[in-house]
């Protein structure tokens, strides 16, 4: 603890209580726990200076006219260091060398020679320059009896008279020592006043030489080896040198508390701390560099030696460069790292101390220091990377990567990370990670462009009645499309492959309610189980749901799913019991079954309207439409503002060969016009053309109107929100951001998590089936991909969709499939141009499907065919060894009796001895019955056999078995 001091010791030294000293330390930004804590030497020095400045007089006494010399005359180099005793005035008669050392005293007027050093930075005046030039020519002078006494200093020629003693300077930053080589001819620069730096001096004498070192303004010789009074030469001329003092002759360090105090001089200049004796004008802190440079030297501004334990480590006596007398240059001993001195520590700023204090409390994961939070909520987008997380918490991404590696996850800084990993990492650092939902993220994106979605602009007077949007839902083959055909008086069902709806259709029909004509918008959704997402989108975009249930079939799984979608979207349901004209129809049974799902008929006291219809015969269709309109008028407020920018939803989208990307859009509010700039999901464009369900052009689409929009630059996703913006530039920026977010989320979802524990298993060879999906519209491709990814056939085979798109199979798809060994699945599309020829040449398999479940079944069979076969053991029979015949050619021959089953030649066998397995994998190499070779011997017959294992004994049991391939489920 060299250089350190305890708080209670400092308090006793300064004459204050420990409590007051602790309060002072707290004001200075030092973190000290108690009075027994230690503080560093720089902190103790600041405390002494602080209390010294408080006890010093406010204003120094005015000096007389003759007070021309600076305070702080240098003592003789040979004088011993004063001890901690009461100082005597230095202006008295000549004392012994121990008493000649000057001490800081209160400034008072006096003659040219003033006592008491006041170490201040050297500030040579401008008239000093001529003398500095002539100084190297002056010869070294020996001390004479008539010379100035030690501790005194003559006024420099041409220097202005000092008006008073300079107050003690504040400690400042220490410049690196220049010229620490005693043999260097390069002088040390002056601190903070480089313009007044003296010129180059002569070569330094060696450590044992006592000759003077000529130089401009260098008035302090090197400390001598023998103490003795040596007069200091006038500043500006050379001073006599002498041998270096021995460490034993150095006096103990004086007690700063017992010394007279002085008023500190304000300003940024650096200098020595109070209480240290000796030093030239501008002398530095005790044992440290003075005002000029750190290290001894007699130049103006030279200090009393090298810093204590600083750059000159290892000087005997605990600090390099401490002179034996005032004004002497620090010796070269210890200047080059010789051990013996404690290393000097620089002062730390409050920010550094605060950072160190925070790092002490920072959590460590596997030895990695991480920032520590206070439970803050960090919002991250789905699929964010560690770089995004590190930017939020102001951390190093490399540290997060290493921390995740220690937690068993191998990711890179720019790789998308799934939600669970982000939450786990955040909890380790005391952060609450919230993965922003896509809806919230999209809302924040639109808010950044001053856009909102889902709200009508204006007040109540701007709202107008709009037609209800009705979605027809139900199980497959229950008659949904037939019902819409009957309503529209068209045959849409025959256009669908297999009679199964595989798209969402949107139509607007005119119906009559009493004497009033009313418009109703119908949305037809698929009923197959693969189209769950389509049904969910239909439920979200609708006002009323018609649940079609076949009277002869009852409630089916997709019926229940449709009910759940409608109830989740808080949509009222009207039940249409279809096929009442068929044999075995039981509408009452349907009503009873639906009560289990919260749909209670009105005749049973509920609030759900049931209508028995026959879509094929056209029975009660008007009653169903009337029920829909009554429900809409009674339960819903169907109004929207048509005088605003249009907002809607893309129900379906596909790529048309002649028209390009086409989206079926349902307008929810506002009016969509030709020429509007639009954005839907990650697709944007300008409305070039709008077509209704009859193929007629539409110039403006009002709320609840379904239209086909032509003009997108790419195919939007099914279910994406459509928004009209002011400029194409804004639409493009929104689409680009959504596209980037979509890619990140897809990468995070598709990334296979590989932890350190299952690294060996991950490195094993696994079979992978690569697919490229092409469909006629976005919804079909989405449904097909979700259905295929849901196939579970085991961990040995993995399905991977490397590309997906809308439109025909192109040559680009074939080239990608050839490079990645993939199969192309075309759903309701065919190959374009020379794609088929290229596929045949490259050996790429293209499969075409028109019904979705056929594609699912074939892909599942292909995956199962890629699985490694599973074998099961089937026991054939058991035989007991009754005798052993030894042969020099074939070895031991076992004479056996077949106890059960049969024994076959070349079958695998297991040798048991006292019910203990002796040989596990042996083979029956030969089998004979009497003298004939046979392939099989049945139960109850004797035989002779040889095994691939010769250590057999009488009484052993041979168990024959075979491995048969087990079919995959």
From Swiss-Prot:
Location of the region described as Disordered in the Swiss-Prot/TrEMBL record: 50-370
Chain residue ranges for the region called G3: 524-527
Compositional bias annotation for Basic residues: 344-353
InterPro entries reported in the protein's UniProt record: EF-G-like_DII, EFTu-like_2, IF2_II, IF2_N, P-loop_NTPase, Small_GTP-bd, T_Tr_GTP-bd_dom, TF_IF2_bacterial-like
Chain spans, region G2: 499-503
Family: Belongs to the TRAFAC class translation factor GTPase superfamily. Classic translation factor GTPase family. IF-2 subfamily.
Compartment annotation: Cytoplasm
Biased composition, class Gly residues, residue ranges: 269-340
Record-listed GTP binding positions: 474-481, 524-528, 578-581
Cellular component GO terms, alphabetical: cytosol
Keyword list, A-Z: Cytoplasm, GTP-binding, Initiation factor, Nucleotide-binding, Protein biosynthesis
Location of the region described as G4 in the Swiss-Prot/TrEMBL record: 578-581
Region (G5): 614-616
A Gene Ontology molecular function term of the record: GTP binding
Biased composition (Pro residues): 77-87, 112-124, 240-267
Residues in tr-type G domain copies: 465-636
SUPFAM superfamilies, alphabetized: Initiation factor IF2/eIF5b, domain 3, P-loop containing nucleoside triphosphate hydrolases, Translation proteins
PANTHER family the UniProt entry points to: TR-TYPE G DOMAIN-CONTAINING PROTEIN, TRANSLATION INITIATION FACTOR IF-2-RELATED
Function: One of the essential components for the initiation of protein synthesis. Protects formylmethionyl-tRNA from spontaneous hydrolysis and promotes its binding to the 30S ribosomal subunits. Also involved in the hydrolysis of GTP during the formation of the 70S ribosomal complex.
Source superkingdom: Bacteria
Protein's name in the database: Translation initiation factor IF-2
Region (G1): 474-481
């Amino acid at each position: 603890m060299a250089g350190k001091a305890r708080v209670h010791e400092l308090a006793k030294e300064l004459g204050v209580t420990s409590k007051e000293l602790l309060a002072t330390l707290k004001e200075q930004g030092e973190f000290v726990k108690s009075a027994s804590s230690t503080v560093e030497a720089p902190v103790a020095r600041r405390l002494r200076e602080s209390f010294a400045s408080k006890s010093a007089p406010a204003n120094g006494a005015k000096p007389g006219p003759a007070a021309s010399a600076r305070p702080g005359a240098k003592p003789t180099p040979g004088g011993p260091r004063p001890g901690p005793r009461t100082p005597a005035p230095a202006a008295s008669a000549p004392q012994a060398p121990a008493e000649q050392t000057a001490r800081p005293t209160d400034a008072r007027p006096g003659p040219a020679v003033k006592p008491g050093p006041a170490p201040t930075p050297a500030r040579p005046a401008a008239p000093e320059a001529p003398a500095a030039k002539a100084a190297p020519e002056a010869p070294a002078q020996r001390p004479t009896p008539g010379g100035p006494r030690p501790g005194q200093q003559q006024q420099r020629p041409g220097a202005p008279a000092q008006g008073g003693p300079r107050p003690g300077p504040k400690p400042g930053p220490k410049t690196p020592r220049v010229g620490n080589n005693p043999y260097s001819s390069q002088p040390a620069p002056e601190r903070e006043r480089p313009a007044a730096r003296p010129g180059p001096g002569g070569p330094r004498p060696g450590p044992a030489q006592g000759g003077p070192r000529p130089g401009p303004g260098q008035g302090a010789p090197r400390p001598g080896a023998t103490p003795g009074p040596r007069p200091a030469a006038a500043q500006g001329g050379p001073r006599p040198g002498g041998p270096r003092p021995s460490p034993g002759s150095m006096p103990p360090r004086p007690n700063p508390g017992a010394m007279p105090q002085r008023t500190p001089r304000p300003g940024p200049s650096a200098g020595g701390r109070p209480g240290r004796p000796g030093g030239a004008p501008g002398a530095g802190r005790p044992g440290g560099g003075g005002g000029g440079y750190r290290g001894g030297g007699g130049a103006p501004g030279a200090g009393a030696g090298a810093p204590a334990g600083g750059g000159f480590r290892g000087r005997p006596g605990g600090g390099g460069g401490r002179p034996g007398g005032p004004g002497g240059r620090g010796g070269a001993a210890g200047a080059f790292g010789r051990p013996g001195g404690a290393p000097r520590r620089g002062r730390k700023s409050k920010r550094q101390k605060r950072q160190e204090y925070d790092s002490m409390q920072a959590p460590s994961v596997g030895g990695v220091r991480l920032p520590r939070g206070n439970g803050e909520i960090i919002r991250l987008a789905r699929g964010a990377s560690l770089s995004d997380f590190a930017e939020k918490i102001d951390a190093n991404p490399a540290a997060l990567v290493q921390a995740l590696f220690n937690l068993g996850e191998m990711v890179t800084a720019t790789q998308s990370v799934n939600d669970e990993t982000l939450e786990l990492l955040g909890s380790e650092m005391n952060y609450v990670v919230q993965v922003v939902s896509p809806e919230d993220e999209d809302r924040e994106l639109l808010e950044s462009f001053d856009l909102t979605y889902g709200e009508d602009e204006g007040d109540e007077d701007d709202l107008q009645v709009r037609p209800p949007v009705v979605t027809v839902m139900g199980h497959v083959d229950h008659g949904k499309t037939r019902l819409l055909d009957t309503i529209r008086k068209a045959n849409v069902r025959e256009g669908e492959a297999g009679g199964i709806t595989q798209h969402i259709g949107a139509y607007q029909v005119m119906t009559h309610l009493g004497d009033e004509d009313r418009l109703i918008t119908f949305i037809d959704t698929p009923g197959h189980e693969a189209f769950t997402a389509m049904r969910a989108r239909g439920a979200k975009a609708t006002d009323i749901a018609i649940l079609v249930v076949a009277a002869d079939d009852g409630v089916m799984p997709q019926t229940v799913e449709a009910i759940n979608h409608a109830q989740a979207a808080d949509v009222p349901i009207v039940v249409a019991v279809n096929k009442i004209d068929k044999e075995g129809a039981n509408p009452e049974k349907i009503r009873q079954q639906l009560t289990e799902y919260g749909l209670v008929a009105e005749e049973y006291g509920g609030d759900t309207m049931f209508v028995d219809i026959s879509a094929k015969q056209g029975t009660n269709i008007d009653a169903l439409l009337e029920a829909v309109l009554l429900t809409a008028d009674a339960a819903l407020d169907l109004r929207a503002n048509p005088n605003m920018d249009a907002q809607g939803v893309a129900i379906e989208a596909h790529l048309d060969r002649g028209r390009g990307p086409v989206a079926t859009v349902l307008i929810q509010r506002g009016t969509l016009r030709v020429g509007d700039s639009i954005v839907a999901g990650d697709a944007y464009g300008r409305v070039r053309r709008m077509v209704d369900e009859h193929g007629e052009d539409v110039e403006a689409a009002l709320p609840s109107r379904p239209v086909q929009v032509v003009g997108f630059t790419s195919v939007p996703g099914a279910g994406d929100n459509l928004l009209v913006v002011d400029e194409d530039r804004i639409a493009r920026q929104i689409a680009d951001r959504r596209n980037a977010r979509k890619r990140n989320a897809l990468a995070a979802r598709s990334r296979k998590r590989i932890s350190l524990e299952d690294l060996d298993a991950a490195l094993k060879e696994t079979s992978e089936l690569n697919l490229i999906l092409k469909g006629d519209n976005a919804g079909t491709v989405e449904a097909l991909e979700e259905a295929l990814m849901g196939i579970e056939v085991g961990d040995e085979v993995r399905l991977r969709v490397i590309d997906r798109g809308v439109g025909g199979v192109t040559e680009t798809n074939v080239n990608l499939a050839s490079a990645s060994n993939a199969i192309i699945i075309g759903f309701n599309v065919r190959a374009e141009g020379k794609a088929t020829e290229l596929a045949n040449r490259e050996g790429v398999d293209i499969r075409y499907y028109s019904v979705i479940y056929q594609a699912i079944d074939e892909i599942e069979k292909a995956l199962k065919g890629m699985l490694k076969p599973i074998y099961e053991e089937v026991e054939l029979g058991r035989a007991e060894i009754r005798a052993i015949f030894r042969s020099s050619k074939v070895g031991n021959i076992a004479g056996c009796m077949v106890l059960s089953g049969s024994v076959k030649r070349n079958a695998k066998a297991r040798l048991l001895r006292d019910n203990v397995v002796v040989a596990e994998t042996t083979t029956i190499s030969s089998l004979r019955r009497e003298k004939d070779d046979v392939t099989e011997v049945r139960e109850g017959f004797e035989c002779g056999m040889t095994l691939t294992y010769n250590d057999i004994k009488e009484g052993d049991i041979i168990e024959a078995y075979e491995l048969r391939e087990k079919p995959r489920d």
